[in-house]
């Protein structure tokens, strides 16, 4: 029980540390700035797509009202009115103006993907046609699916089994959870589809559930603050809604990025988190596996390494292989794996450590045991090196500073 509690606390602490390392607060601020300029283009594109289908006429206004009533605190009514006016003006733009709005919406999606790729340590973002098709699908099919789902839910809510005198017990209670379920679905889709890497659906679902619950809590607390502390009206007057809306967007992006860190953290092996190895040792492990594969005439894949007992986090695997590729020690094979591209018989451990960005670990950083054939010899060499260092630098600091005399 104590071990589980320790692992649980360590897991959440590691998530917080990664959030700080990835500049989560700064990225949330950047996304808030981007959202400020992209919200009107996104709404314009959504209304344009919905108005193109006669069955969805007027659905856009209903969707907008549903979003502001359920996903934005009580200050959203004024902002909604502003956005409605801006969107009405945007509909009168020429095709060139509409194109600029679409580009703005595209840039917002690009910024979101870049931020997620930093969290997932993805070094190759989507490019070319794959990137264009994904963003186009979000901007075109997204509003249509949203409109269809909203129309279906409205029809279901109007059935006598839901709202009539013969309504099923608990049906209205279930409908009350519709905003929460919508949030879970939206967050899950965001975490599963946006990163340019494979994200397990169950991890995306857990992250979506976490973010949706945190989102509802934040909305309730934010609304409570607005009602109990109205002093901001004395400062900003009629414009008080605008800074509050920006703060809410910022909090929303903080929640999104925290959920993304959780989804990434769930995919990392727990045993590995409990027993971290110095990066220099990971480098030697990967080289040993590459050498063993080369002797069999095969390439090394990340999945095969995990099945072999090395539950190495994917970001550490990528960092090590990037270094080996830069130093022309390993290269990609045609099948997606990795092979050695240099004869290790003519390359010493000293040469490797000289060009490695990761320093040689101290004895205190080494695990007691490691199932690697080279590990006993390395540990003995480090012990001799430490003893020699003590012998060379064991005199008092005052003697060193005084110099020979």
Curated annotation (Swiss-Prot):
Intracellular or extracellular location(s): Cell inner membrane
Keywords linked to the UniProt accession: Cell inner membrane, Cell membrane, Membrane, Transmembrane, Transmembrane helix
Transmembrane stretches, start-end: 36-56, 93-113, 132-152, 174-194, 204-224, 238-258
Main location class: membrane
Keyword Kinase belongs to the record: no
Pfam families according to UniProt: Virul_fac_BrkB
Top-rank taxon, per record: Bacteria
Gene Ontology, cellular component aspect: plasma membrane
Keyword hit for RNA-binding: no
UniProt membrane topology term: Multi-pass membrane protein
InterPro entries in alphabetical order: UPF0761_bac (IPR023679), Virul_fac_BrkB (IPR017039)
HAMAP family: UPF0761
Similarity-based family: Belongs to the UPF0761 family.
Protein name: UPF0761 membrane protein Pmen_2988
Natural source organism: Ectopseudomonas mendocina (strain ymp)
